[in-house]
Amino acid sequence: MAVLVYTENWDGSFKKLSFELVSYGAGLASMLGKPLVVLSIGNVASSELEKLGKYGARRILSLSDPALQVFDNQAYAEAIAQVATREQAEVVVLSNNNTGKAIAPRLSVKLKAGLGAGVSKLPLSTNPFVVYKRSFSGNAFAHVEIKTPVKIITLAQNSFGLVENPGTPSIETMSVPVDPALVKTTVAEAQKQTGKLLLTDAEIVVSGGRGMKSPDNWGPLVELAELLGGATACSRPVSDEGWRPHEEHTGQTGKIIAPNLYIAVGISGATQHLAGVSSSKVIVAINTDKDAPIFEAAQYGIVGDAMKVLPKLVEAVKEIKHK
């Protein structure tokens, strides 16, 4: 029996998300008294795989197959299911990002396993096996008991943090038979984004809503994000109006993020928006309406016009950086 963690890579490199998964898996394996097995799919160099050892990985399985060169939900779910069966995995851990959300339900069916989605902490108990997760668009918390022999967990991003447990992992190259007919995905064209921090990777996010009043007013917001080393985001109405690209839309129907600092500018704080940002460590709200719902979710608030507040924040950050 083992705890199996699937770590996604991006063009052969791991990100914080991957290290957080390994940290969580190591903690879970310790609770259960089971070995931790980390699975990587695709062409990843040994030097990159060894980085997982810093967070508790001691045994890494590197799976590479022509049928798995392009991500496909069905093919990846089949491959992970085969590895889980071979390793007699009691718990399989994935990220709750788009990839994990696509794979986990399929994996659940293949393994006849109960699924705890969007978990944010280690289990409250292991017998019974009870996990802790947000529910009702982030407005409540739920304790979910998973009763099946095999269990699947998807971990909410930036919810557990990185726990260093350095060691030298063993790396095993392996293969599993994956039917090429399962692969329904083809890549017609690949465009890489360069020079811009990905929203889901950012530890600081500055987000704007309709309170920005016009697409022409985003200069100070973008400048503040750049000064802080963060990313920009927006509410759904803003992206629907075409003020900002849809890739910046956060909320229940957009990207789910959990940065260390989320600055909401001119955003009222509708339930749908808060569902996508409520896992942020610290929320700062700037709004002219002192009764806006966003202030109830925020740790800090400024009641004022964004057009007046943002330039002052920009100047304050510049002064601090120049000291």
What are these regions (language model features)?
Residues M1-K323:
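N-terminal glycine-rich FAD/FM-binding segment characteristic of electron-transfer flavoproteins
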